[in-house]
Amino acid sequence: MKAFRIFTLCALCALSAQAQKQYSLASPDGKLKTTVTTGAQLSYDITFDGQQVLENSPISMTLDNGEIWGENDKPSKVSRKSVDGEIKSPFYRADELDEEYNEMTLQFKGFNVEFRAYDDGIAYRFVNKGKKPFKVVKEGVDFNFPFDVTAHVPYTIPRRKGHYNEQFWNSFENQYTTNNITKLEKEKLAFLPIIAELKNNVKLCITEVNLESYPGLYVKPGNGNQLTSDFAPYPKRMEQGGHNMLQMIVKEYEDFIAKVEKPRSFPWRVAIVTDEDEELASTNLSYLLAEPSRLEDISWIKPGKIAWDWWNDWNLDGVDFETGVNNPTYKAYIDFASKNGIEYVILDEG
């Protein structure tokens, strides 16, 4: 009987090992590496120059038909490619950007998961291949750190304490709070980007790219050394209100976060990793990961500087009229812009 139990246990372990497979992807310079694990739970980790940055972090997407992408899924094919080229960036800080990365696509039934490794970051996204409409009930996005890292997070500013969903109605403006992950406030959401400090001056910046017809990612403390995710539910009923009656206020929510009508790519989940602080500001990953422009003719777009009324609260010195949202104020802004070679004037809410 004892021998039978040992045999059964060994057989189960062998089946588990067979069901679980790992696929690795490295950046072009070899410093950044992610290992993707499939089987019971799709997950990935990140190392930088041999140092653990993220431990196995589960990812998933739950559909309204009960299907969960990323659970008990086995890829039918894994394809790879490398890109080394340039992309045009006519309205960016450079006219052209170098683009170099390695990509790995895991193909599952009905969906793919794409991973990219750049020299300064790792990114992944889900891709829907099916043509039937469905609703996304939940997306699982977790970040499991190897220890209780220090994080810099911008909390949403709650309008009413104790009303959790009202945090989704915010201006995405706040000062950053610095604390260990385990000491972050559990009922407060933080918007992106956030930065985590690891050993040897390694920093990890979490952000997202290509957000379209989908709610933005918020993070909050999870279990242990974990940041987990939350998303604004899809609006069910809205009323006009807010500042100067300019906004639609959600009064009731659906039990899902997004509608999907056709094949599409979902937002990139991005981890920028570096041990040089200035690279956090100079990285071009957000631009490189974004979809190409859909405009065929961009000749009419003329970038330029702007005289901004809101920035100084409509305050003007040396004028003989009362400043505010009125014609004399904007005439003064137009004259100022013309005199100083400023191409545009913005009417923030006038």
Briefly describe each language-model feature range.
Residues 21-289:
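N-terminal accessory beta-strand-rich subdomains and adjacent acidic, glycine-rich linkers
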